[in-house]
Amino acid sequence: EHYTTARYLSVLTTRLIADFPEFYAKYYSKRDYTYNNIRQPNRNRLLAIDPSVDGVKTGHTDAAGYCLIASSRREQPGQGFSRRLLTVVLGTASESARAIESQKLLNYGFANFDVVRLYQKDQPAASYPVWKGAASEVKAGFGGNVLVTVARGSGERVKGEIERMQPLVAAIEQRQRIGTLRVRLDDK
């Protein structure tokens, strides 16, 4: 017997993709594979019908029904980067139902949500005064792109605010944390 939740499956899949990208790219998008001279088709039907789908896992038990964790990566128009969405569909009545419901969720997510880049990796986001340093100020930024997912059309209303630690006293190391980012939509 084994038990899990949709949330845990999504966390596990997110870590799989992030921590083992070379294995993910090599194995999870294959439409079939051969082992011990036996050809096995991938039961993830979305791989055959949606070129943006690149995995992940099908399953079936009498208790859980037909299940599918699907991943899709699509370009963000005009943004210069792509976005990945995951779906976890559990308890459907058939293989085709799990594919249909997963595709609906992916299409809904891509059609109704946008990713906004608040800050670009390694670019100064702000400058702050520094005490007892050779320089009078320090530039603050982020070690990675800061991306936020919001409802379509609300991207212009998203704002980031860096709440810095006070006071900033030298010496400050590169990549040292000097504050907290607060993200607000309509001042909430």
Where are these regions (language model features)?
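Domain-terminus/edge residues, biased toward the C-terminal soluble/receptor-binding domains
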Residues: 2-3, 7-188
